[in-house]
C-alpha cells in the first residue's frame, strides 16, 4: 500500500530500477495507514497531528526513481484496470520499467461518503452463473440458485455488476 511504500517500499522500488528488474510493481494507494490504526501518511497531505502539510505524490516519486510509464487507475474499474495491466506488460516487453498505482479511498474510513447506493440483483435476469461470487465480495451469496446481495454489507462498488455477463446486477442510487 501507499503507507508501506513511503515507509520502506521506495528503497525496493529503487533497487528494481537499478537492477533492471523484470517486474511490474503496484502501489495500492488508499490514502491511509490501514494496518496500524488508520493514521495519515506522507501521501495524505496531513501530519500525524492532523495539520495540513505537503502531499507527496506516489507517481512523482516513482517517476523520479526511473519508472516509466507510471500508470494510475481506479482498481474497481475492471476495464481500466485490465487496460493498465496490458499497457504495463507491453511496456515491460518493450524494455521499459512500468509501474501501476491503484487509487481508491479506504472503505473503512470513507464508507459513509462513498456509499451512495447499493447494488441489487434482478432475479429475472440472473441465471445463477456464479460469476459475481468469484469477486469474493462478502455481500453476495446464492439463494435458490440465484445471486442475492446483503444490503447491510454492500458498499456499492459495482465490481459484481461489471463481471455479470447477464447485466443482472445494477446499482440503486440513494
Task: Show where each model-derived region lies.
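Short, ordered loop/turn segments at secondary-structure junctions
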Residues: 28-31, 75, 104-105, 145, ...
